[in-house]
Curated annotation (Swiss-Prot):
Active site positions, chain numbering: 12, 40
Cofactor(s) this protein cannot do without: Mg(2+)
Annotated source species: Candida tropicalis (strain ATCC MYA-3404 / T1)
Protein name: Adenylosuccinate synthetase
Residues where GTP binds: 11-17, 39-41, 307, 333-335, 415-417
Length: 428
């Protein structure tokens, strides 16, 4: 059976920390979507490990790790991330596997990603992309012109000729669209000819890999990337990523049936953040937002960009839960709220004076909503490292209880600090 960890807001909720905790007792950790456009840091024995594309289960020496078919892979970044982990003492090459069906991100995808964003910014419609080429790669995938891992690693000499033909078609189509931008495609092709050999040992048929693990009754953890509000279908479109980041992406990104999923853990930051553009109803462009940003160290692992900050939005979480069906929640970074005398939570949206029955799909409406807040007294004490739920201040427990009751989902874990061990588990 599979347990799944998913982001419930706009990303950066702290999924990696929960995955790290759960990985102590699993056999397989799998990534199902996204690429190296997201990131998180895991601290083990005072050593920091930065993850972007690779599964966090690599920190567990007994865990096998799969980069699934729904992930898009920039091969140079794949090896760079692997080398960075190895430089910090992780021996993980024989525990890392890549789906033969995953699509490849090329440097020209990254170039055109930035060119497209520059075009949009002139009309003040920029998405806020990371520039990692993720969107253009999913675009070529959807148009059936993309290149998959098996196209690269097939040892048949004819396969390499086919790869080069596919590659040049993509380059030429981008040059027609954006002009003769500065790009040495021959140099990239030469690099990928070498990657044919170096990537091949990692490549597996991920459908067989996953179904063999399921048949053997292995404990499997699926690590979601990004979050529901960045989902290509259900997020704040077009200010989203280009993949399915919810429970649907788990099924399509790994090729597993719904009945194999046992638990869906929703990771929720105790307040709200987002990176990039797009409406953000509970955003606080004031001292509150600045405090959350500073105390929470809200800077992106991948881009270094400051994250926009605001109060917890339960309208977003109710919508997120309706789609993903969380069995329990992990509330992270509760300690960031320690110094607030008063804490607010968004509980409803009003548009033109009328309360909306659900989260609006139209961003024109979303940008105009008035948030209805419920105020809570803060606990105004340091909760860092508290390991028992019973030891939390009453006001903190009241805050958490309200979240549970509003969503109808139990809270199973609470993050009380940045350290790996600063995560208490609550009986549910």
């Amino acid at each position: 059976m599979c347990d799944v960890v998913l982001g419930s807001q706009w990303g950066d909720e702290g999924k990696g920390k929960l995955v790290d905790l759960l990985c102590d007792d699993i056999d397989v950790c799998a990534r199902c979507a996204g690429g190296n456009n997201a990131g998180h840091t895991i601290v083990v024995d005072k050593t920091k490990y930065d993850f972007h594309m690779l599964p966090s289960g690599l920190v567990n020496p007994n865990c096998k790790n799969l980069v699934g078919s729904g992930v898009v892979i920039h091969v140079p970044s794949f090896f760079q991330e692997l080398e960075n982990l190895e430089a910090k003492g992780l021996d993980c090459r024989d525990r890392l596997f890549v789906s033969s069906r995953a699509h490849l991100v090329f440097d020209f995808h990254q170039r055109t990603d930035k060119l497209k964003e520059a075009e949009l910014s002139t009309n003040k419609k920029a998405i806020g992309t990371t520039g990692k080429g993720i969107g253009p790669t999913y675009s070529t995938k959807a148009s059936r012109s993309g290149i998959r891992v098996h196209h690269l690693v097939n040892p048949d000499p004819a396969a390499w000729e086919d790869f080069k033909t596919r590659y040049m078609r993509l380059v030429e189509s981008r040059q027609k669209r954006y002009g003769q931008f500065d790009y040495d495609y021959e140099e990239e092709l030469a690099r990928y000819e070498k990657y044919r050999e170096t990537l091949r040992p990692f490549v597996v048929d991920s459908v067989v890999f996953m179904h063999d693990a399921i048949a053997a009754n292995k404990k499997i953890l699926v690590e979601g990337a990004n979050a529901l509000m960045l989902d290509i279908d259900f997020g704040t479109y077009p200010y989203v990523t280009s993949s399915s980041t919810g429970i649907g992406g788990v099924l399509t990104g790994l090729g597993i049936p719904p009945r194999t999923i046992k638990n869906v853990y929703g990771v929720v930051k105790a307040y709200t953040t987002r990176v990039g553009e797009g409406p953000f109803p509970t955003e606080q462009l004031n001292e509150v937002g600045e405090t959350l940003q500073d105390v929470g160290a809200e800077y992106g692992v991948t881009t270094g960009r400051k994250r926009r900050c605001g109060w917890l939005d339960l309208v977003v979480l109710k919508y997120s839960n309706a789609i993903n069906g969380y069995t329990s929640l992990n509330i992270t970074k509760l300690d960031v709220l320690d110094k607030f005398k008063e804490i607010e939570v968004g509980v409803a949206y009003k548009l033109n004076g009328k309360e909306l029955p659900s989260f609006p799909e139209d961003l024109i409406d979303l940008a105009k909503v008035e948030v209805v807040y419920k105020k809570f007294p803060g606990w105004e004490q340091d909760i860092t490292g508290i390991s028992k739920y019973e030891d939390l201040p009453e006001n903190a427990k009241n805050y958490l209880k309200f979240i549970e009751e509003y969503l109808g989902v139990p809270i199973q874990w609470v993050g009380t600090g940045p350290a790996r061990e600063s995560m208490l588990e609550k009986k549910i």
